[in-house]
């Protein structure tokens, strides 16, 4: 996950084991390299951010702008989510989770496209779960083992919080932050994929 500057704050993260469908299997195969030997770091600051943000309520900052954004992004998301009502609900949640952590919603969309192709049941070969492919160990790290990472809202909160944390830690160096998020620090293949996708969403 690499790219230009992105601001501060933090929010959700992690992945737990769940339904592995044929679609998940095909997707997982293509992402095996990205998830090989993940090296995701845990620290007290990130734990606290997750705890602070996991309970936050979702809301748009500007209703008119949000609705205009939803309509624009809906057309772009159609290739992944056919049903228009489901598409708008999903976009609303993504926009809200991104804004709560002061992330650009289009960047979060790019991460999701690369991570799961918008399949919130996706499970990677190493167990990363949900739409933002969060690792299940994060639940224990913040003392919330009961959290369901397949739940869309929960997964977005975890994922956005983690991504924001790594952006702050890397002082806005998006490529580095994305590599840390993906557990592939030192390799920029994953970051390049996300940044290419980001260009399409912006």
Region roles according to the model:
Residues 51-202:
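Catalytic glycan-binding domains that act on GlcNAc-containing polysaccharides
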């Amino acid at each position: 996950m690499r790219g230009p500057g992105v601001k501060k704050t933090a929010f959700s993260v992690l992945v737990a084991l769940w339904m592995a469908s044929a679609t998940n299997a095909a997707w997982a195969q293509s992402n095996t390299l990205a998830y090989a030997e993940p090296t995701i770091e845990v620290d007290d600051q990130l734990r606290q951010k997750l705890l602070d943000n996991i309970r936050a309520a979702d809301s748009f900052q500007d209703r008119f702008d949000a609705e205009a954004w939803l309509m624009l992004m809906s057309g772009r998301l159609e290739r992944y989510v056919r049903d228009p009502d489901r598409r708008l609900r999903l976009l609303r949640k993504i926009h809200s989770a991104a804004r709560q952590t002061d992330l650009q919603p289009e960047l979060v969309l790019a991460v999701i496209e690369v991570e799961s192709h918008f399949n919130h049941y996706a499970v990677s070969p190493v167990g990363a779960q949900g739409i933002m492919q969060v690792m299940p160990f994060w639940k224990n790290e913040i003392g919330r083992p009961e959290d369901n990472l397949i739940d869309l809202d929960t997964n977005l909160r975890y994922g956005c919080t983690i991504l924001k944390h790594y952006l702050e830690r890397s002082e806005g160096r998006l490529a580095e932050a994305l590599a840390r998020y993906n557990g592939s620090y030192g390799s920029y293949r994953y970051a390049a994929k996300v940044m290419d996708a980001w260009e399409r969403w912006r």
